Amino acid sequence: IHLVLLLLAFTLVAWIAARYDRPAARNLLGHYFDSPLPAVIQSVVLVYRPPLLDILPLYILLVAITPLVMAAARRTGWPSVLAVSAVVWLAAQFGLRSALHGALHLPIALNLMGSFDLFAWQLLWVGGLWFGTSGLPMLQSRPERLRGLLHAAAMLAALMLAYRHLAGPHGWMDSATRQFWLDKWSLSPLRILNIAAITGTLMLVGPAIASRLRALLRPFEILGRASLWVFTAHLASLLLLLCVVGSDDRLLDGAAGLAAAAAGFAAVFVASAL
């Protein structure tokens, strides 16, 4: 799937960007326009990861390490695996990725290797593996403790939602502090806390909502079951949309914006039905 998206980007999207002067698409593929052959080779081996095309490589790499994680969990237990994952995540918060890039002298700029920090995001993946295989059954075996944790998670989620909308995107912080606590690319501490709080909230209220709104939620259930294909269709739609947008700062509004949104939604629902 990733190779198909790369093919779309490096052929049709690149041709339209060059032929019809589409800066948004050209800037997305800047490294490819500067060095076509190295960019193609580097992208195939998941080193060069242009914006929008840097999420599937992350997914591929995390899937690749899953057998190793599961084997380590069976051999040493989940506590040690989670501890190692947490230490790697903590090191990522203090620049592990950039330090390794400098030490290895890689022939590609760090900003061309994708926005998402693998060393940070692996914690979410490993945590999900633990939760699905061991964590959730363990919590369900202790319903009193689980109930208390879920109510605490719901309160925390409400507080963080209020903080986000009262403090705004800057969060009452200077840029350096905000980078450490709220950065999305390195899955910063408050991001981890927020994900845990939302997960607990959904566990608390999700079953009741699903039972009452099952018919309304059915389309989203279908999207979730075909999430990989839905995401692929979404990315392809975005790449093609960049061929329509004339510049980075031009917004589609009015009829053009509605048409683009309708086409995007249609693409993901068609993909989920295939």
What are these regions (language model features)?
Residues 1-274:
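Alpha-helical transmembrane segments and their immediate juxtamembrane cytosolic regions
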